[in-house]
Amino acid sequence: RLVKEWYDMGLLGQVKEVHAWQPPLNNSKAGAFVPSTTFPPQAMPVPKELDWDLWQGQASERPYNKVYVPGDWRGFYYYGNGKLGDWCCHTLDAPFWALDLGMPYYAEAKQINPIPDHTFVSEQSLVTWKFAARGEKAPVTMKWYEGFGKPEVRPEWGIDELPVEGMIMIGEKKTLITGMRPSDARLLVPKEEWEEFKKNPPAKTIPFMPLS
């Protein structure tokens, strides 16, 4: 809500760049993207409590392997599409809504993938989308970095480095930053300016939805 309110009231000015980034996909064994030790994953007996046919849904038939269930299926192209599919709907929802982006006219993907058969999502990827102007709204270039570095920090942002993951909307007037979920928006301005902004925030224009 804050992202759209701040954009609509002109705090950012025209936004021509959006960047979102996350660390490499496969470097954490605690997440939902752990690759198999062999490719393709070897067949294993199906647990008695699992209806493997039902679980696969409309995907092509493949032998069961414990690496798929319950969560690591996200990293395999025949079941999921990695962090791009898992996180973009959260991280990039706010700029899509605020900027009224619609469909891109251009898309490009660069990736580094050590998996021989490319059935598992890449360890590093950089995806670029370009969106045409929408009325008075400027054209936008959006980039998704997955283990492919981060945008360069600009002096006017008042920070030394960007966090491990997040999203920024770079405006002609100001730049906005959020985490991977856009509920913690803040302006990238010097600390004193941000503290003053928090003391005197702009009026809310989008009503909260009732809880019941």
Which residues make up each language-model segment?
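Contiguous beta-strand/loop segments that form the cofactor/metal-binding neighborhood of enzyme cores
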Residues: L2-S212
